[in-house]
Amino acid sequence: MKKILLAIMISSTTAACAQQFISSGTIEFEVRTNNHRALGDEGFWVDMFKDKIPQFSNTYYQYTFNDNKSIYKFERFDEKNKLPRGFGMSNPEDDVWYNDYSTGTFTNYRYILGDNYLLSGALMNIEWKLTPTETRDIAGFNCRKATGIIFDSVYVFAFYTDEITVSGGPMGINGLPGMILGLTIPRMFTSYIATKLQVSGVDVRAVTPPQKGKKKDLASLQKDALRVTKDWGKYGQQALWMMSL
């Protein structure tokens, strides 16, 4: 009996030592969007747009994190299904999201409605429901499922790992006990999936808030955008959600 207990203790200690906890690194996210579904089916202009853009597009973003802070920005397009520049309200090449999870604040640089803005404020407070029994392997990490609600009624489905200690994820999504490596927003017809993680040779000096752009309150910018998108049909709501993430 003593031998069995000793074996269990050794096994548990070995497993604990083997588990890694990562607080600094760079994650590549692949973002896949069904553009035709996002456009909806309201108005003659929708069919015109659908003829000019790919049904699906893949865009890659770089998420660098250190000291409980992160910066998320454009990396590259998949040239086979690249959207034309200027489609929608913003250009992904220009946008930068900086989050400080210790203070619960963000500073974002966004190109919206033809101008560059520096936005800052409090991170979204997302109510999460954890489903730890449902797991998925993403980029070599065992991730647990969680369901949250943003913008009052928009469900998001996330898979996170507690092996990466930063409580973050793509854009402003946050608040789970670990890093979000998989995210789906069905009503936005978009998914985010981590494809790789780099922990060595990462330039953590890049994790600094953007400085340029016109300072503006997000709520005020949302009002301006609402006036512009009021005739855009369902896609107008999509654009407003994307602007607010």
What would you call each of these model-derived segments?
Residues 4-13:
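Sec-dependent N-terminal signal peptides
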Residues 14-18:
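Sec/Tat signal peptide C-region and signal peptidase I cleavage site
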Residues 20-245:
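Extended soluble regions of mature proteins
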